[in-house]
């Protein structure tokens, strides 16, 4: 009863939650609450009143379960996709900046080459003029005046200044080109580091998706086991209640028939024998080697430990398969970029909601069996009334006890 109250409170709290905060367990709590309401309706009006409604409700709850599971997986995938898109945009921006920088370097080199070509042409022209002057000086025996000598010295000084300026410009441009090359190397190193970070993030994303699928499979398996155990427990309790009710009716009917026949003493003897047989049965149960030796809580603890061990074994198997696949890929040595793993919709197993609502079909079978047993008891009572004067034989009493 306390577990039922706890599940009912959990289902009511799940109904009061916000839609964005719902989990798969909340959906199953809601399904449990709906199942209890169906039980009440069946107890009052029978199974035929809601026989056509149950499949539709089950389908709606399954759709809600799928949507909630997608909603919990979608935010993490969206964040990873946004991070990947941001890294791609940064990479594209850096590539674009490198292209612009390369174009600027090419333009600077073209300008430098043009200026160098002009200066070289000027140098060649000056050298030609110098040669002509030297030839003219060799052919002429005219002595230069001091003014002409100073003029010639000024021309040579001007050439030296031009050459010095050209050398300074060339050295400066060479230093700029070296600095640009260094910056380009640093940019390339940054791009390689970003690519390595991108591959690492994609690998982490793949591992996280793998773990999410494993955890979802474990959760679904545990939820299905819980639902099956709850359904079995409910059916067993209902069967025990029906059997107790039938046993009480049979005892009342037997006592009434014996009182009508005026055989009160055999009834007392029969009651004494039943008490003795029950005491012997208790003694035999205490001596029985197959009697239960565990409490319900201990059994639950053992089942819980078994489920944890199963989940650990499942995780280890998944990790072993994953590492084996990585070793096979490394042996093949095929350098391929890690693919972007898009989430694929795996074939959905049988939902736990169907298992939760499957006990209604068992209730129908149980009601049919109880009706058949009641008919048998009625026919047996009619036969006993017809043969009231003859008394009960030993075979009839054994059959009555068996029933």
Swiss-Prot record:
Subcellular location: Cytoplasm, Cytosol; Cytoplasm, Cytoskeleton, Microtubule organizing center, Centrosome, Centriole; Cytoplasm, Cytoskeleton, Cilium basal body
Phosphoserine modifications at: 7
Subunit structure comment from the entry: Interacts (when S-nitrosylated) with GAPDH. Interacts with RAB8A; interaction is dependent on the phosphorylation of 'Thr-72' of RAB8A. Interacts with RAB10 and RAB12; the interaction is dependent on the phosphorylation of 'Thr-73' of RAB10, and 'Ser-105' of RAB12.
Family indicated by similarity: Belongs to the RILPL family.
Name of the protein this chain belongs to: RILP-like protein 1
Residues found modified as S-nitrosocysteine: 47
Alphabetical GO biological process terms: cilium assembly; epithelial cell morphogenesis; nitric oxide mediated signal transduction; protein transport from ciliary membrane to plasma membrane
Molecular function in Gene Ontology: dynein light intermediate chain binding; protein dimerization activity; small GTPase binding
Organism (species): Bos taurus (Bovine)
Entry PTM: S-nitrosylation is required for the interaction with GAPDH.
Function: Plays a role in the regulation of cell shape and polarity. Plays a role in cellular protein transport, including protein transport away from primary cilia. Neuroprotective protein, which acts by sequestring GAPDH in the cytosol and prevent the apoptotic function of GAPDH in the nucleus. Competes with SIAH1 for binding GAPDH. Does not regulate lysosomal morphology and distribution. Binds to RAB10 following LRRK2-mediated RAB10 phosphorylation which leads to inhibition of ciliogenesis.
Stretch list, region Disordered: 329-348
Domain (RH1) ranges: 10-97
Swiss-Prot/TrEMBL keywords: Cell projection, Cilium, Coiled coil, Cytoplasm, Cytoskeleton, Phosphoprotein, Protein transport, S-nitrosylation, Transport
Chief location: cytoplasm
All copies of domain RH2, residue ranges: 291-356
A GO term from the CC aspect: cytosol
Stretches of the chain forming a coiled coil according to its record: 76-265
């Amino acid at each position: 009863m306390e577990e039922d109250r706890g599940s009912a409170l959990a289902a009511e709290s799940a109904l009061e939650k916000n839609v964005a905060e719902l989990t798969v367990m909340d959906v199953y709590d809601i399904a449990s609450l709906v199942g209890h309401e169906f039980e009440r309706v069946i107890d009052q009006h029978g199974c035929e009143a809601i026989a056509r409604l149950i499949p539709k409700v089950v389908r709606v709850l399954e759709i809600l379960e799928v949507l909630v599971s997608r909603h919990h997986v979608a935010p993490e995938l969206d964040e990873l996709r946004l991070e990947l898109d941001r890294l791609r945009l940064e990479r594209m921006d850096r590539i674009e900046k490198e292209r612009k920088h390369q174009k600027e370097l090419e333009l600077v080199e073209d300008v430098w080459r043009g200026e160098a070509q002009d200066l070289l042409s000027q140098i060649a022209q000056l050298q030609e003029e110098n040669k002509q002057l030297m030839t003219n000086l060799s052919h002429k025996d005219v002595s230069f005046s001091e003014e002409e000598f100073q003029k010639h010295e000024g021309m040579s000084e001007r050439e030296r200044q031009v050459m010095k300026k050209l050398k300074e410009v060339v050295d400066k441009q060479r230093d700029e080109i070296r600095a640009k090359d260094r910056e380009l190397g640093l940019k390339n190193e940054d791009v390689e580091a970003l690519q390595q970070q991108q591959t690492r993030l994609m690998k982490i994303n793949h591992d996280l998706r793998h773990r999410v699928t494993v955890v979802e499979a474990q959760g679904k398996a545990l939820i299905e086991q819980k639902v099956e155990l709850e359904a079995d427990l409910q059916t067993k309790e209902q069967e025990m209640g029906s059997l107790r009710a039938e046993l009480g009716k049979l005892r009342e009917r037997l006592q009434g028939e014996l009182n009508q026949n005026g055989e009160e003493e055999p009834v007392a003897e029969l009651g004494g024998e039943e008490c003795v047989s029950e005491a012997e049965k208790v003694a035999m149960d205490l001596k029985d080697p197959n009697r239960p030796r565990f409490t319900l809580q201990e059994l639950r603890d053992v089942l819980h430990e078994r489920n944890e061990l199963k989940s650990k074994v499942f995780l280890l198997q998944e990790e072993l398969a994953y590492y084996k696949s990585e070793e096979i890929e490394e042996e093949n040595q095929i350098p391929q970029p890690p693919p972007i793993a898009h989430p694929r919709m795996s074939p959905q197993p049988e939902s736990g909601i169907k298992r939760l609502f499957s006990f209604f079909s068992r209730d129908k079978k149980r009601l049919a069996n109880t009706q058949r047993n009641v008919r048998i008891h009625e026919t047996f009572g009619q036969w006993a009334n017809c043969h009231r004067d003859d008394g009960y034989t030993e075979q009839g009493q054994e059959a009555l006890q068996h029933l």
